Amino acid sequence: MSELANKKCVPCEGNIPPFNTEEIHKYLKKVDGWEVFEDKIDGFHLIKNYKFENFLKSQEFVNKVGEIAEAEGHHPDLWFGWGYARIKIYTHAIKGLAESDFILAAKIDQISNA
């Protein structure tokens, strides 16, 4: 189990700087299969794609992610359909990544590996 999965997401109100690329790569090693993307609007963000055998399995997974997000107070962007789910995580208030993004990714990894 990732040490990050044992931590709690901390609410961010924009009072911290986003991670730099060195910090991002350090934390990226602690989560499984997540990719980092950068865009001009949202800065760096984490993305992971999942495959499932049918629509219901995708929906069940997204519902579990939603429960974790609510419990952590940190909400990813979610897309899903027949046989797939896609998750995008970043901290909106700082337009980039912070430790809480990787904590949420690690918690999601736990349910995807269960």
Predicted segments, located by residue:
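Long, contiguous binding/interaction regions
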Residues: 1-56, 60-114
